[in-house]
Each structure stands twice: as structure tokens, then as C-alpha cells.
Amino acid sequence: MTDSVCFDRAAEYYDRTRSLRPETHRAVIELLSRELIGRSCLEIGVGTGRIALGLAEAGTKLAGTDLSLPMLQKLVGNAGGSSPFAIVQADATSLPFSDAAFGAGLACHVLHLIPAWDVAVRELVRVIAPVGVLLVDLGGPGGTLSGTIRDKFCAAARVKQPRPGLDNESELDSLLDDLGATGRALEPVIEPHVATIEQMIARLESGLFSSTWSLTDEERRAAAEATRRWAEREHGSLQEEHAVETVIRWRAYDLPAP
């Protein structure tokens, strides 16, 4: 049995809590589509199709895998009842595809959920043909106000590993460098929005994010209250709106020739 984090419980609310503004979503799809011209692509952790459905609509030939059947069922619903590409319930650390089956691979906000993330990356590289490309967005709010609040909440709740898998871009760079790939940063995409500190804390308290799933309701409430006390000391009113800028950072890894 895998120890990767499964998103069965999040299927019904995932899109509501992870959606981007239409113009931001278009910018992400255009950015990735340019890298995928003429290539078939496998997305691991395809989920509800948040990225893949847009790429398919833009003309990319795709396949997708996910550990969670409810997430894949939501993808089918989002697609109008029939997925426009092949989807398979599978563990990213053991992909059911032959070597060099695809021209590209894609991993968005998934490697941090896989303790054996290095195995998943090697598997994804295995199914990508030579001179193909691997596209990765690690995600996470690090370095932002929301990231600081998440860290304070998890510390108060004594969550030891909010991200049980990959949490360091340099580790990914090092592994792929060992595999002969060349990494490059794609143009960042900015998603601006406004939120209060209370809203940020409430989202953690409600258990929407996988980093809080190991906690009981009582533990989340206690951590939220501790975080509120800290935030009031540091920032004053919890109801004041803050401009929050999410920077979406994709990296491309060009795989070597055989």
C-alpha cells in the first residue's frame, strides 16, 4: 500500500479552493502549451483536471493518472461526462506505462505529497522519451504571509511534516541533474488576490488542506486560536484585507538524448 497522500476526501471541494482567475488560468495553459507543442504528455496527480482539461482543449495529447478515484470521477464530471483523454487510477511511484511512452511529463502540486518523491520522478522520467521535457510546479505558499500563517498553525498543532514529500526545489534539480536533465525556469505567472488573516486561518482550521488532515477537529481549533493570538500581536486586526500575490513557478527539465 502506498504512503502517498490520497485526496479522496478533497474531491468535492478541491476545485472551489484551488481555482485561479480565468486570465491567470489561461496564462498558465499558454505557458505549458508552448512547451508541449508536438508532444504527448502524461500528468501524474491529474486530479480533477484543473490543468489537464485546459491543455487538452488547447490541443495537447494527454493521459493522466491519480491515486484518488473520486478525483478522477470529478475530472470526468468537469469534462461533461466523458474524459477527452485516457485516465488511470495509479500510484505515481509505479506507473503502468512502457518506457518512453510519452514526449513529456507534468507534475503540478503533487511531489510534496509523495514521501518517495524521487521514485515518482524516476518513474516519470522513465516513461518520457529521450529529449522530452518534464514540467513541474511544486506549489506551496512559502515566503508569503499565508505561508507564514500556515507554518505558525502547523507548529502550534505540532504537525511534524506539513509536506511529507519534496519540499525543496534544489533536491529536485540535483536528482534530475544526476539523470542528465537540464533545468530551466519558465516565466512566472502572477495570481493577485485579497484576503484577511482571519480567512487564511479559517481555511486551515476547517481542514481543507492535506497538511491538516492528521489533526482532530479539537486540535485544529486549538491551533487556530494560537495562530490568531500570534497574528493579533504581529499584525493587529485579523479582519484587515491584505494584498496576497501568489507566484506560480513552473520549471522545465529537458531530458538528454539517448
Question: Model segments located where?
Answer:
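Conserved class I S-adenosyl-L-methionine
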Residues: 1-37, 50-54, 71-74, 78, 133-164, ...
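Class I SAM-dependent methyltransferase SAM/SAH-binding core
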Residues: 42-44, 48-94
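Conserved Class I S-adenosyl-L-methionine
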Residues: 48, 184-258
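A conserved beta-strand element that flanks and buttresses the S-adenosyl-L-methionine
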Residues: 106
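Short catalytic micro-motifs in class I SAM-dependent methyltransferases
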Residues: 109-113
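A short glycine-rich, Lys/Arg-flanked "PGG" loop and its adjoining helix->strand segment in the class I
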Residues: 118-133
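Short alpha-helix
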Residues: 164-179
